[in-house]
Design a protein with these regions (language model features):
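A glycine-rich beta-strand to alpha-helix segment
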Residues: 114-145
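Short amphipathic alpha-helical segments
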Residues: 30, 58-60, 86-87, 120, ...
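Short glycine-rich anion-binding loops that position phosphate/pyrophosphate groups of nucleotides
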Residues: 50-53, 78-81, 134-137
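C-terminal helical cap/extension that packs against the catalytic core
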Residues: 64-125
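Generic structural signal for residues in well-ordered beta-strands
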Residues: 6, 17, 106-107, 129
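Nucleotide phosphate-binding/pyrophosphate-handling subdomain across enzymes
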Residues: 1-72
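Short, solvent-exposed amphipathic alpha-helical segments in soluble enzyme
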Residues: 33-37, 61-65, 89-91, 125, ...
Length: 148
């Protein structure tokens, strides 16, 4: 985890892309607070890959409130880490609650290719994009330049 703290990966059309290990609501909030205080005027886009459905269920409210300092959240599929999908968790409800509680725009992508396509179509100008999570998001962030 120490190696993955707000590491700059690449720049695309004036937008800087970073990678961070944050996968818990407190970490997400702290990283976004830090980015917001350093880049007051820039648009902040958080690409979030949730890690473990059990964690999402246990901390659902905290997660949905943790993105307030971002402008946009791009939600990736849950990295299950081998967990079986638990009943009683709705991904779409989770996405809606993030929008409502954190007051952000939110987009859902199904894989790294859809993520790259979304970035190509919507990202231009000076922005800060940070990929967060403890799953495969780090390798997605490193592969993005080749997919753009």
């Amino acid at each position: 985890g120490v190696q993955r703290r707000f590491n700059k990966i690449f720049t695309y059309k004036e937008t800087n892309f970073y990678d961070d290990y944050a996968h818990h609501p407190t970490e997400i909030k702290e990283i976004l607070n830090g980015i917001r205080s350093a880049y007051k005027k820039d648009e902040i886009i958080c690409i979030f890959q949730p890690h473990r459905i059990s964690r999402l269920k246990d901390l659902k409210k905290e997660f949905t409130l943790s993105f307030k300092k971002a402008d946009t959240v791009i939600l990736c599929p849950v990295y299950t880490a081998g967990e079986k999908i638990k009943l009683g968790f709705s991904y779409n409800d989770f996405a809606r609650e993030i929008m409502k509680n954190s007051k952000v725009k939110l987009f859902i992508v199904k894989d790294k290719y859809q993520l790259a396509k979304f970035i190509k179509q919507t990202i231009y100008g000076k922005k800060i994009v940070v990929g967060m999570g403890a799953g495969t998001i780090s390798s997605w962030m490193k592969e993005l330049p080749k997919l753009l």
